[in-house]
Amino acid sequence: MSKVLYIKANAKPEGVSRTFKISDSFIEEYRNQKPNDEIITLDLYKEGISFLTEEAIKLHVPKQGEGKDHHVLKYAYQFAEADKYVIAAPFWNLSFPAILKAYIDYICVTGITFKYTEEGAVGLCQGKKAVHIVSRGGGYSEGPFEMYEMGDRYLRTIFGFLGITDFTTIVAEKLDVVGEDVEGILRNTIEKAKEQAKEF
């Protein structure tokens, strides 16, 4: 049985968020395929994730005797215990919502999700897999605007730093481009997400 961490990073609610329409369809199909797996949903906005403060940074190093419910380290422990990750985050201002970066600052903890050796940093989350589900208003997968896409590239890089190299992206884009069949794009992406869920 695998443990799936479903990370949601969008201020828009269910039924409004185009990203969540895709990611929820992915999760539903995954649950149908693997009903015995545990799916933990972490909605970053509902969770109230904040930026690391001076006090939090001081507590950002695990110490002997501190449990997994530690208010600063709990997200890193939760992340490390998962086997698979589904990240649902829209494309905002060439990246993703700032709350997701704040969350990443919580989960990148030496001794929990990575460590330092004489050869450099080594990820402690090896052998796991992740999928990033994203919706974009414009087209950034190819062409002249490809260089402006920094959200998926950053996630792929930071997850690789933590040892997670099996990283897939499911994207619906050009959703705000005049003349595009938006409903058709969403419909096709949802079907693609369901197919990906069967193999995840």
Curated annotation (Swiss-Prot):
Q: Which reaction does it catalyse?
A: 2 a quinone + NADH + H(+) = 2 a 1,4-benzosemiquinone + NAD(+); N,N-dimethyl-1,4-phenylenediamine + anthranilate + 2 NAD(+) = 2-(4-dimethylaminophenyl)diazenylbenzoate + 2 NADH + 2 H(+)
Q: Which organism is it from?
A: Clostridium acetobutylicum (strain ATCC 824 / DSM 792 / JCM 1419 / IAM 19013 / LMG 5710 / NBRC 13948 / NRRL B-527 / VKM B-1787 / 2291 / W)
Q: Which Pfam families match?
A: Flavodoxin_2
- What GO molecular functions are on record for this protein? electron transfer activity; FMN binding; oxidoreductase activity, acting on NAD(P)H as acceptor; oxidoreductase activity, acting on NAD(P)H, quinone or similar compound as acceptor
EC?
1.6.5.-, 1.7.1.17
Q: Is NAD there in the keyword field?
A: yes
Q: How does it assemble?
A: Homodimer.
Gene that produces this protein: azoR2
* Name assigned to this protein: FMN-dependent NADH:quinone oxidoreductase 2
The first-level EC class reads oxidoreductase
Q: How is the cofactor bound?
A: Binds 1 FMN per subunit.
Which residues of the sequence carry a binding annotation for FMN? 135-138
Q: Which cofactor does it need?
A: FMN
Q: Which InterPro entries match?
A: Flavodoxin_fold (IPR003680), Flavoprotein-like_sf (IPR029039), FMN-dep_NADH:Q_OxRdtase_AzoR1 (IPR050104), NADH:quinone_OxRdtase_FMN_depd (IPR023048)
| Domain of life of the source | Bacteria
Q: Alphabetically list the UniProt keywords.
A: Flavoprotein, FMN, NAD, Oxidoreductase
Q: Which family does it belong to?
A: Belongs to the azoreductase type 1 family.
What function does the entry list? Quinone reductase that provides resistance to thiol-specific stress caused by electrophilic quinones. Also exhibits azoreductase activity. Catalyzes the reductive cleavage of the azo bond in aromatic azo compounds to the corresponding amines.
